[in-house]
């Protein structure tokens, strides 16, 4: 007798991945990356120019930091990543720490519970920050990390001062209406 065309069944249950938690994680990653602005908007050369004064520079810094914060974070992380290429141990530690941050801080739906005690976000943030600094400093790449952070901060500061803010949509509703072409006009 053959079982041609029959679907074999297993007597033991295979471990199933929690599809719901993966879906939530995917949604949170997309929501986090949704705050990233288009790179062509960030580097639009027609929107570059020197500020008229110190107050204009501070206004641009404040506006651009708020508007391009995810892009700036990506730039700083890329600078840190490239600075650690010659330190493979530090690069591995950095990569592991990024994954830990993603799962313990950014993708978490529910508060962390440890021995029936609930740990708040501020504590998680402080512990992860201290752990990140200590582990990266223990990898003997302190000079590279500090240099990369300073380089990233200088790049962000230069861009935020030079990038004009007049064409930025600070109101999300206006931005989505403008990009979707659903502009309404008052009827006469």
From Swiss-Prot:
InterPro entries: Prenylated_rab_accept_PRA1. Disruption phenotype: No visible phenotype. May be involved in both secretory and endocytic intracellular trafficking in the endosomal/prevacuolar compartments. The chain crosses the membrane at residues 74-94, 95-115, 123-143, 145-165. It is found in: Endoplasmic reticulum membrane; Membrane; Cytoplasm. Belongs to the PRA1 family. Expressed in lateral roots, lateral root caps and columella cells. The keyword Mitochondrion does not apply. One of its GO terms (biological process) is vesicle-mediated transport. This is PRA1 family protein F3. Interacts with PRA1F2 and PRA1D. Interacts with ACD11 and BPA1. Its main location: endoplasmic reticulum.
């Amino acid at each position: 007798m053959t079982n041609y065309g029959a679907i074999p069944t297993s007597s033991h249950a295979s471990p199933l991945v929690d599809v719901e938690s993966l879906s939530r994680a995917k949604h949170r990653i997309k929501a986090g990356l949704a705050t990233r602005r288009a790179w062509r908007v960030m580097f639009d050369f027609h929107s570059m120019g020197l500020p008229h004064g110190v107050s204009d520079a501070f206004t641009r810094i404040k506006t651009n930091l708020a508007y391009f914060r995810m892009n700036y974070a990506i730039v700083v992380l890329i600078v840190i990543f490239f600075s650690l290429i010659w330190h493979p141990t530090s690069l591995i530690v950095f990569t592991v720490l990024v994954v830990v941050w993603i799962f313990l801080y950014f993708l978490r739906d529910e508060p962390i519970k440890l021995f029936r005690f609930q740990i708040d976000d501020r504590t998680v943030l402080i512990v992860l920050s201290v752990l990140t600094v200590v582990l990266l400093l223990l990898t003997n790449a302190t000079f590279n990390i500090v240099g990369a952070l300073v380089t990233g901060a200088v790049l962000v500061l230069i861009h935020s001062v030079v990038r004009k803010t007049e064409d930025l949509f600070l109101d999300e509703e206006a931005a989505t209406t403008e990009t979707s072409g659903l502009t309404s006009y008052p009827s006469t």
